[in-house]
Amino acid sequence: MADKQISLPAKLINGGIAGLIGVTCVFPIDLAKTRLQNQQNGQRMYASMSDCLIKTIRSEGYFGMYRGAAVNLTLVTPEKAIKLAANDFFRHQLSKDGQKLTLPKEMLAGCGAGTCQVIVTTPMEMLKIQLQDAGRIAAQRKILAAQAQLSAQGGAQPSVEAPAPPRPTATQLTRDLLRNHGIAGLYKGLGATLLRDVPFSIVYFPLFANLNQLGRPSSEEKSPFYVSFLAGCVAGSAAAVAVNPCDVVKTRLQSLERGVNEDTYSGFLDCARKIWRHEGPSAFLKGAYCRALVIAPLFGIAQVVYFLGIAESLLGLLQEPQA
């Protein structure tokens, strides 16, 4: 990507198209990942990704799997555009006379891209996590209320079902966070997001560039689209699993609502320490399989759109009548 100059509007459009397609395809898996990561050992409601999705459909309907998708679809365009364009920019700045970047420089470019994207990623994930996890907490409270009613009635079937609490909306959450905490409320978990996204980009972009280079027919030609797709999938899933422990901590820190008897956390280290002590080291890999399934096609699609130059074609069509 460093050897090809692409206009800023094209970068933004390519990133936006890729993000919208990717999020639409994999959002239910991302919802399962959030709920699996947030459930603590004493309050397990879901045994696996498929179990989570089946229970979500039964209790919340098909569209329950897309809770929080509107936030992602709105903000994923600037997020993906910033990430891809920033990496392209840093690679170009670090390259000299079109020479191939060394691995340290590739990692530095990825670091810059990961740092830039958290401007959008942190508030996006902050809102998305509340909306995604609301169904899990509501279901848990409903089960506990039914159990309490059964106990109070001596085992008799409860006659009246407790009404479900109203679901929060992204607008309500944003308004409440800004009113109570200011702009800092939307950026809760910023440090954890940086610790996840910067290492992710350091791993992803150099790995993708080298895998993509392997499938290039010659130094003068672009890689075929399927090579870019596979390179994006492999690099994305590898980077996603590598930083999953930080993603678990970030998800826990950004969750405002807690289930019954669930731990609260004062910061990154406190959260990591409590997870290790109460749930064991395997808890840091919760949702890793889901995250790999989300990230692989997301970045595979992104790289295909980026390398096919869909935005350049669209911009070219718009400019043709003026020629």
Curated annotation (Swiss-Prot):
It comes from the Eukaryota. Keywords: Membrane, Mitochondrion, Mitochondrion inner membrane, Repeat, Symport, Transmembrane, Transmembrane helix, Transport. The chain crosses the membrane at residues 12-32, 62-82, 107-127, 189-209, 223-243, 292-312. Solcar repeats lie at residues 6-93, 101-214, 223-312. It catalyses: L-glutamate(in) + H(+)(in) = L-glutamate(out) + H(+)(out). GO terms for molecular function: amino acid:proton symporter activity; L-glutamate transmembrane transporter activity. GO terms for cellular component: mitochondrial inner membrane; mitochondrion. Mitochondrial glutamate/H(+) symporter. Responsible for the transport of glutamate from the cytosol into the mitochondrial matrix with the concomitant import of a proton. Plays a role in the control of glucose-stimulated insulin secretion. This is Mitochondrial glutamate carrier 1. It comes from Mus musculus.
